[in-house]
C-alpha cells in the first residue's frame, strides 16, 4: 500500500467515525459523494414558489416569538461594547441615500450594512434563539442561531419597500427554513472541526429571505445561493470574543450582497450545494441527502424539532445547569457563604465549547460554566447586567469561581452528545449535598416560553438600554398581530430614536 492509499484510507476512516451512523460522503474520490442532482434548484424553487398561505398558523405563531426576541436583542445589543464600534464603521462608509434603520439608534445605513449592524447587535449578548437538531449525531443536539442571519436583512428590505407584516413573516420563514435544513444536512464534521454554522449556514438563510423579497426567479436564486456560499464563514475558535457576533452579522449582510448581484445578472454555480466541489463537500466533507431532499417545510423546522429561546445571555450549553442551580437555590434558600464547592459534570464536548474556566470579561463569562453558576449563587439572577465586564471581575465572583469544578462525568458522557446532560452537586459547609440533573432548559420545545414570557424578555432587553415604555409596548403589540401590520416601517419607527 503506497502513501496515497494510506492517506485515502485514513480519511475514509475519519469520515466513518464522524458520521456516527448517518451516511455522509467520505472525502475521497468524487464518485463516493452522495448524489442529489438538482438540490440547489429544489431549494431555489421552494424559495420562489412558497406563499404566505402555505405556512401553518402555529408555525407563524412560533415565528412571531423569535421575531420579537430578535428585535429585543437588537435593542439590547445596540448598547453593548460592540454597538459604538459597529456604528462608527458603518458611518465611515457613507454609502448612498437609500438607507434602513439601525435598531436602537437614530442612524440609518445601506441595507447591507444595516443588516450587518443589526445582526451584530442581535448576537452581541449571545442571547438569541437556537436551532435544535433532528439527528442524534449532532453535538449537544444544537445547530445554528437561526434568526440572526435572517431577520436583519428581511426587516431592512421590508422597511425600505414599505412591505407588510405578512411579507416580513414569509421572508423570515423562507430564510430560517432554508438555513436550518442546510445545517441539518451537512456532515457533523463541519461544526466538529471548527466552523461556526451561524456564519456559514446563516448566510444561506439571509440570501433566501432577500431573494424572496426582491422577487428573484429560480435561476437568479440559484446564482444568489452560489454567491452566498462563497461569502459565508466563521470559526468556533472566535467564541468568547467580539468576532463571534461579527460572524453572525456578516451572515446577515451576505445575503443582501448576493441577491443584489444576482438581480443584476451576476452568475455563479447553479448547483453549489450538491456539487462534489461545492459547499457540502468543501466545508463538511459530505452531507445527508435525506435531511434536505424533499424536506423543506416537511416539517417546518420551527415546528419540529424546533428552536429554543434563551433564558440567559450565555452559551446555550450552560442553560440546563443554570436552571437546575436556580431551582436548588430557591428550594433550599442557599446563601453564598454556605457553599463549600460545586461539581458540575457534563460530556467532553460541553467543556470544549464552554472553554473559559477563569473568565475576566463579560464575553468570556458567556462561555464559562464556572461563571454562570457562580453568579447565580451570588446574585440569584443572570441577565444582561450580570454579563458585563464589571460583574465578572468582582472579587466575590472570582472567589466563587474557584469553588466550581466543571468536569467530564462518565454518566453524562454515556448519555450521548445529542443532549446537554448536566449533573449538578452543591456541597454545603454543613455536609449536606444538593443534587440536580437536567438535559433541556426553559425556552426549549420541551419547556417553551409563551408569547407573554418572550414579551417579558423583550421588556428586559428594552429596559437595559432605557428604551421608552410606550415604544416597547408598541413593538410587542405590532409583532403579536404582525399579519395585520400594513407597513413594516411602523415597527422600525418604534425601534429607533
Report each predicted region and the residues it spans:
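Amphipathic alpha-helical segments within well-ordered protein domains
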Residues: 47-48, 154-155, 207-208, 326, ...
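N-terminal secretory signal peptides
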Residues: 1-5, 26-27
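Intrinsically disordered, low-complexity Ser/Thr/Pro/Gly-rich interaction regions
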Residues: 315-466, 473
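Membrane-embedded hairpin module used as a gating/binding unit in multi-pass transport
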Residues: 286-330
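Flexible, glycine/charged-enriched surface loops at secondary-structure junctions
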Residues: 58, 81-83, 266-274, 331-342, ...
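N-terminal core-entry segment
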Residues: 9-19, 24-305, 484, 488, ...
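Hydrophobic alpha-helical packing residues
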Residues: 175, 179-182, 228, 325-328, ...
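Conserved acidic/glycine
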Residues: 9-11, 18-19, 424, 435, ...
